[in-house]
Each structure stands twice: as structure tokens, then as C-alpha cells.
């Protein structure tokens, strides 16, 4: 998507890293045509280009099919969890592809980036409208401090732009698209709608997908809030912290519904549930984005999996159930937003 290309160009200009250069290079591969403009709703040709681009971004395949549920509140670390999920898939399910190729085997159904790339009738994309909104509300002072001072206005105005153009049906279409093409699926959720999640898991399990839940966990909402402000200044969408639908509330909902999603997933013959402390240092973050997972074990909170194997017609269930020693303490939430 053009939005992603522009995002990585901006990142490499502000923080040069080889990982961003590698991502940009994928968009200039002559075998992957770049869609001019964004996805135009109710336009068949535009939809076909969008689906072709989604397919081209997932050039590899795995021996099994996986539904990776990236679980947790906004700004908790679901982007980096895609890499972590790919690592565990290789480790546990004995995939022969490299971790990087496993990562490239996924169709991404994340609704935010789909929405950002929607092209309006005026020719502007939603990401452009959101960035114009920042200019209108903050002027030249685009500091974190000024964004926090104006968070109520930024959150409400950006939400109005986002919600009126959010095409959830396009995200759902990608599930069936992935099934048809035998591709793996990334699904993002805060866990606010467990019945919907259960329906999707049941559907994809019927088609042979192994459910994997990755829950990047942070117990301090002020960390999420600061992350969301930083992301908002780049992408244009802002979230309040202390309102009924704010970050603190979503953080509580995710944690409260976590046992429910675990119960659903653990019914299947193969699954993985992995919860970890996602408050990584910059160095650890850089390593993971470079497919170096050597420090990951230090951040594990909960690890549950079942892998069914058949040897000489005998079915064996290999079960792992590990919880960190300070698990209960680690889950104590600090809901002080620190907005002022």
C-alpha cells in the first residue's frame, strides 16, 4: 500500500535503519506493482488491484496454515508481535521456511492500515485527511506536550474521519481471500468482541487454520498513552486515555477477556497462546525487527501450546504450560494516564 511506503520513507528520513530500507525495497521490486492512489470503495478495478497487492506481499507459504490473533489494546506492540509469532511458528511447528519467509506468508487484515489507504472521491487518502487534521489543530507546534494539551479535540476529530471511512467488510473479505489462496492470516483485536472472535476462529479452524494468540502486555497505561501520542503525530489518529472508550478502558477489557479467548483457543487440537511483557528496550526492539530473538525468553509471561503429532498411527498430544513466577504481580494494572 502506498501508505506503508510513505510511512517507511518518513521513518528512514528521521531514524535511518536498515530494516526500513529493506521494507522500502520491497515496494520497488519490479515484480510487485505499486497501486497508484489508494483503495477506492465501490470500485471493482481498485479492489482487484488491492487484492493483488495483498497477495504479492505474501509470496511464501508454510506447510500448515495459521491464524495469528494479535491481541491487546492499541499501542501495546501488535506490530512487532507479527515477528514474534513467526518465530514461534518455526520453533514449535517445525516449519522449514526461515522466520522471515514465515513472516512473508501472511495476509494482513489490520483495519487501520486498510482505512488509512482508502481514497476519497476528492482523490485524497484518509491518511492525508488525518495529517491535514493535525496541521489544522496543532499548527507548527507538533510536540507531544502540545498534542496532550489538545488531545480531546485531536481524538474526536480524527475519530470522525476514521470511523466514517472504516471498511470493516474489506478486512473480512481478506479472510476468505487468504483461505482461497492458502495463505496465513494476521488479525488484530483489542478483545472487545469475543463472540465475533469466536466466530472467526471457528470459521478458519474449519478450513484447517491453527489458532495462535499473541498478547503483547504492558501494565502501565501511561506507556500506552505516550506511544499512542507518538504514533498519532505520524499517522494522524489519536486516542484519549481516561474516557469510557479510552486506552485505560481498552486495557482493562483486553485483560478481562483474555481468559475467554484462551478457553476458546484451547479447545483445538493445535494452538499457541503467548503473552509477554512488550515494554522492550530500543535495542531489543531493533533486534526483533532484524529477526534476532535471543532475548525473548526474558519477557515471557505465559506460554501455553498443544501440538498434536501422529507417529505410527498413534496420536500424541504435546502440551506446554508455563507461567512466569511473578505473573500475578506483572498483571497489576497502573491506570494513571499521566495526561497533564
UniProtKB/Swiss-Prot annotation:
Q: Which keywords are on file for this protein?
A: Virion
Q: Name one GO cellular component term.
A: virion component
Q: What's the domain of life for this entry?
A: Viruses
Localisation: Virion
Q: What is this protein called?
A: Uncharacterized protein L872
This protein's species is Acanthamoeba polyphaga mimivirus (APMV)
Amino acid at each position: 500500500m502506498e501508505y506503508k511506503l510513505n510511512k517507511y520513507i518518513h521513518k528512514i528520513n528521521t531514524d535511518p535503519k536498515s530494516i526500513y530500507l529493506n521494507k522500502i525495497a520491497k515496494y520497488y521490486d519490479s515484480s510487485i506493482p505499486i497501486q497508484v492512489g489508494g483503495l477506492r470503495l465501490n470500485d471493482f478495478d481498485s479492489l482487484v488491484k488491492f487484492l493483488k497487492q495483498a497477495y504479492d506481499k505474501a509470496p511464501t507459504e508454510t506447510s500448515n496454515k495459521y491464524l495469528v490473533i494479535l491481541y491487546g489494546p492499541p499501542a501495546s506492540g501488535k506490530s512487532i508481535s507479527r515477528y514474534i509469532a513467526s518465530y514461534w511458528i518455526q520453533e514449535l511447528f517445525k516449519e522449514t521456511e526461515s522466520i522471515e519467509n514465515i513472516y512473508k506468508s501472511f495476509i494482513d487484515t489490520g483495519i487501520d492500515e486498510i482505512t488509512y489507504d482508502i481514497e476519497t472521491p476528492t482523490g485524497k487518502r484518509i491518511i492525508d485527511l488525518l495529517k491535514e487534521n493535525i496541521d489544522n489543530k496543532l499548527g507548527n507546534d507538533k510536540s507531544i506536550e502540545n498534542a496532550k494539551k489538545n488531545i480531546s479535540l485531536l481524538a474526536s476529530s480524527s475519530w470522525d474521519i476514521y470511523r466514517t471511512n472504516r471498511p470493516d467488510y474489506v478486512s473480512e473479505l481478506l479472510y476468505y481471500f487468504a483461505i482461497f489462496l492458502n495463505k496465513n492470516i494476521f488479525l488484530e483485536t483489542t478483545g472487545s468482541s469475543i463472540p465475533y472472535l469466536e466466530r472467526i476462529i471457528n470459521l478458519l479452524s474449519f478450513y484447517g487454520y491453527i489458532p495462535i494468540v499473541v498478547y503483547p502486555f504492558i501494565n502501565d497505561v501511561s506507556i500506552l498513552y505516550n506511544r499512542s501520542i507518538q504514533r498519532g503525530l505520524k499517522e494522524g489518529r489519536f486516542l484519549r486515555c481516561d474516557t469510557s472508550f479510552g486506552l485505560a478502558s481498552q486495557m482493562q477489557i483486553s485483560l478481562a477477556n483474555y481468559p475467554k479467548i484462551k478457553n476458546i483457543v484451547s479447545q483445538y487440537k493445535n494452538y499457541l497462546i503467548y503473552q509477554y511483557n512488550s515494554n522492550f528496550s530500543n535495542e531489543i526492539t531493533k533486534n526483533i525487527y532484524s529477526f534476532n530473538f535471543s532475548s525473548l525468553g526474558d519477557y515471557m509471561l505465559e506460554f501455553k501450546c498443544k501440538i498434536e503429532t501422529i507417529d505410527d498411527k498413534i496420536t500424541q498430544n504435546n502440551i506446554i504450560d508455563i507461567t512466569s513466577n511473578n505473573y500475578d504481580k506483572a498483571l497489576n494494572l497502573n491506570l494513571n494516564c499521566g495526561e497533564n
